[in-house]
Amino acid sequence: MHDLVIRNGLCFINGEFVECSVGVDGNRITHVAKEVERGEIEIDAAGCLVMPGCFNAHTHAAMTLLRGYAEGLPLREWLEKVWEVEARLDEDAVYWGTMLACVEMLKSGVTAFADMYIHMDAVAEAVGESGMRAVLGYGMADRGDEERARKELEIGLEFAEKWNGGFEGRVTTMLAPHAPYTCSPEFLKVVSDASKDKGFLKHIHVSETLWEVKEVRERYGKRPVEFLDSIGFLDSSTVLAHAVWLSEAEMKILAERGVSVAHCPTSNLKLSSGIAKVSELLEMGVNVGIGTDGAASNNMLSVLSDARVGALLQNLRGRTLKPGHWLEMATEGGYRAYNLKGGRIEEGYLADIVVFSKTCRNAPMHDPAAMLYVENQALHAVVDGVLVMEDGILVNVEEEKVIEKAEETALELVGG
């Protein structure tokens, strides 16, 4: 008998949807077939879509507190407004903001996310309580100050070492310097060395705007990716957020170094940043995941919604990709970027699985993959082999309480 069985669903496997059942034991998928033996827990998925959970490859979860704040501004002006409010954040605020994000993500089919922010102990606690999976790092920026650099690295390393493997392995950690324009070359080198010494991943914002490209070129005489490569920062343990404004030479560097990209199409549109060359990156062999960025720069944390926006933008560029490719980026692309064996309905993979029902919004299903773009409220969610949402109701979290506490916190934060 299996620990858990998802039975008779239409399962997303190798880019297509096929009828099958999924057996889970411990935190792994152990059996994928038309017929599997009974499970201690049985989920009837007849008429439903079953797919690996989505991985939000770049976000700042607690920024749900700033959803709808500083609307209508380009990135630099938006950052100035947001940083002013973020300076008032404390552990309690970040906890409730992250809990709200976890509720939203689970209900939209996201089982795991990568987060770089502040007060990260609170983020880790929220992840643990919600039942989600996450890769977490303290967002570091030295701004050319040696003393600040020392303190930032100390905080980042302390957090990474404390929480790596937390909550039975659902939390893993990384080092997360903010960007080439907020971190000095010396600091980035130290972070890169620490990453190699300790075995931590690295995550950084890169080439989000043309302003950033211009700023880095003026400082260092190189484009951002070329600059990072020149100091030895780029390798297969590196994930770049955004990567909108890349030259062909830079894309080749990413492919050669095994760097992954977290594509954030909605955020890039909202902040007037630009449209990333996703099709070209994939053609060159670069692994791409999909991120929402924070709710303040997106308004939602639905990876499937971002996949839809990303697909439409590449269509606009004349570089169309099939819906199945976008689902692969939304799932396995993120897990692969962060060195996790997940994002596939396949034996031996992490049992992070979501189930979507058929509704008036996604019927008829001529192409189930395309229909997931428009119907992205999950019915059931399994993370690490554990049922964390059943019939749309979260198992570990009081949703109404989280919404109430997050709203109270947000109003206090912005002085409402």
From Swiss-Prot:
The gene is mtaD2. Its EC number is 3.5.4.28, 3.5.4.31. Substrate binds at E86, H178, E208, D293. SUPFAM superfamilies: Composite domain of metallo-dependent hydrolases, Metallo-dependent hydrolases. Its cofactor is Zn(2+). Zn(2+) binds at H58, H60, H205, D293. It catalyses: S-adenosyl-L-homocysteine + H2O + H(+) = S-inosyl-L-homocysteine + NH4(+); S-methyl-5'-thioadenosine + H2O + H(+) = S-methyl-5'-thioinosine + NH4(+). Keywords: Hydrolase, Metal-binding, Zinc. Binds 1 zinc ion per subunit. GO terms for molecular function: 5'-methylthioadenosine deaminase activity; metal ion binding; S-adenosylhomocysteine deaminase activity. This is 5-methylthioadenosine/S-adenosylhomocysteine deaminase 2. Pfam families: Amidohydro_1. Catalyzes the deamination of 5-methylthioadenosine and S-adenosyl-L-homocysteine into 5-methylthioinosine and S-inosyl-L-homocysteine, respectively. Is also able to deaminate adenosine. InterPro entries: Amidohydro-rel (IPR006680), Deaminase_MtaD/DadD (IPR023512), Metal-dep_hydrolase_composite (IPR011059), Metal_Hydrolase (IPR032466), MTA/SAH_deaminase (IPR050287). Gene3D superfamilies: Metal-dependent hydrolases, Urease, subunit C, domain 1.
